[in-house]
Structure formats: C-alpha cells, structure tokens
Amino acid sequence: MPLSVEQALANFSQRYVEAWKAQHDCLPINEELVGLASPCIEETRDLEISWQPIVRDEAIRLHNIEQGIELDLHDDFHAFYGTQYSADMTAKFEDMNIELLQVWSDEDLERLQGNMLGHLVMQRRLKLVPTLFVAVTDDEMEVVSICNQSGEVILDRVGTKNRTVLAANMAEFLNKLEPVIAA
C-alpha cells in the first residue's frame, strides 16, 4: 500500500532531523524564527532556537482558502499543510534545491492562507489551472506546486503556463526528497 501524504511528510521530517543531528549533533537550529511562538520550539538561546516538527493533535483542512476562492482544494494540499507544525526544511529533488514550506504556528497558517488565496486569485485572472505551492526553488520565479486538478507535483513558472511534472503525487514527491543541511 502506498504511503499517505501524512506518512511521507512525517518520514521526510524525521530524515531531516536525523540528518541535522548527524551533522551538528543537536536538533535543527534557526535564527530567523527567534521571537515567533511555535509548538516546535525546544529551546530558545540568545539569537537562535532549536526546534523539531510536531504532529498536530488533529489534522485540519484549510477551508478559509476554499471559501475565499470558491474552489475545492486537493486533499494532498490539506494533508501537507494540515498535519504538522514545522520550520521550513531544505532539500534536494533530483538535481534541484528546494525549501519545503511548512506551518510554524497558527499565526503562520493565517499568513499562508492569505498568500495562497492571493496566488489563486492571480491564477484565476490569468486563466491558469490552479496550483497550490508547497516549496520554493533557487529561482524566485519557479515554485513547486500541487496541480489542483490532477494532484501531480509540478515545477510551476509563476504567472505562466510553463509547468513540468516532477511526481505523480505529493507522497511520491516527498519520498524522493533528500534533506540538505547547511554546514
């Protein structure tokens, strides 16, 4: 039986934390999130926090976006953003560096929903098939997204119809990711 998005995300998150520990002998550290509350925080030091992904007590669906744009969003999208809190995680997909976007806190979830709603409104105005971003790349004009119609994970050139299929679904995409830990 294939892995669910929830299982694949949990597996990648665990691989990421283990890779960080192997390289730095501690939990992941972040300097940019200091001062932002999150259930992920394990320890706060002067200019950095240590953190680890935390599974939500109950998975959520991002209905605010669906209601705002009057569009049912793909189940993989809800599973990806609605099952855990985490800092963003860097990874490699084949030869492409990405930063997997995550929800740090409930406040961050509100921000994500606003950004996603704006993204979908822009796509509707441009008459593009709706996509749901899940990661950024080194090229600020390209994002990794879930195609809302097919569920395929694609490399999406923002504001254009240029799209390249990366994986048949989100679970497959997550399973192919390799954690990248900065030195």
Swiss-Prot record:
Keywords: Cell inner membrane, Cell membrane, Membrane
Keyword Cell membrane assigned: yes
Membrane topology, record value: Peripheral membrane protein
Domain of life where this protein originates: Bacteria
Chief location category: membrane
Localization per Swiss-Prot or TrEMBL: Cell inner membrane
Listed GO CC annotations: cytoplasmic side of plasma membrane
Role, per record: Interacts with the SecY protein in vivo. May bind preferentially to an uncomplexed state of SecY, thus functioning either as a chelating agent for excess SecY in the cell or as a regulatory factor that negatively controls the translocase function.
Family under the similarity heading: Belongs to the Syd family.
Protein's name in the database: Protein Syd
Organism: Aliivibrio fischeri (strain ATCC 700601 / ES114)
Phylogenetic classification of the source organism: Bacteria, Pseudomonadati, Pseudomonadota, Gammaproteobacteria, Vibrionales
Primary gene name: syd
